Amino acid sequence: MPESVISIRNLKISFGALHVLRDVDLDLYRGENLVVLGRSGTGKSVLIKIIIGLLRPDAGTVNVLGQSVTDLDSRDLDALRLKIGFSFQNSALYDSMTVRENLEFPLVRNERNLSRADINKRIEEALDDVGLLQAIDQVPSQLSGGQRKRIGIARTLILNPEIMLYDEPTAGLDPITSIEINNLINEVRERHHTSSIVITHDLTCAKTTGDRVAMLLDGRFERVGTFEDVFDSDDERVQAFYNYNFIDQP
């Protein structure tokens, strides 16, 4: 039986009369890329916020790296979050800082005993990992959207997380750059031995990066398996999602 690094059982959350997640069960296994797929507004981002302790569910359990997220105090939750890397949809870089300073910030905040030489080495290694060492002294406004995504991933990797969470990693990117980001997600897993959840509504991203795909439908994961397994379905909701991505889009 594979080891679960994230285990979710009977998860429920509502906002007023709106039931967002209903009796959700899901596992992220060590070393896998798990794609969480669904339309906008289906609760994908809510799920991520629950996993990292930013939202508290109405019911259910969330265990991350053997710890119950809902039972942790703020100090233990902060310690757990250091083991989880979060790659934001908009990269979340500080515009007034250079790339070097953006990557230095989490290091000096969380690993205060590092020497200047060690800090520089970690920054250069992280940038080399994403193929952008040459951008070290540039500011975000000088970079393309794809480059900013890469720098955001580098900043996330600099603390050596065990788990990576990617929020819509290909959103707003052209097809070629999207392929490059998808390949990078796979490379990160191979080089850093991370376990990852990729939140997306992009089927090409799902097919390229996902060892398994979990499709969120009406607040539940109705379909979980390989990409082919998930879409080998007569469910009209599944087929409508597939056709919209691959047929109706220009």
Positions of PLM-derived features:
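Catalytic Walker B motif of ABC-type/P-loop ATPase nucleotide-binding domains
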Residues: 164-167
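Conserved ABC ATPase signature
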Residues: 139-143, 147
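Helix-to-loop junction immediately C-terminal to a conserved catalytic motif
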Residues: 52
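Helix N-cap at the start of a conserved alpha-helix in ABC-type nucleotide-binding domains
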Residues: 175-177
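Conserved ABC ATPase "signature" region
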Residues: 68, 116-134
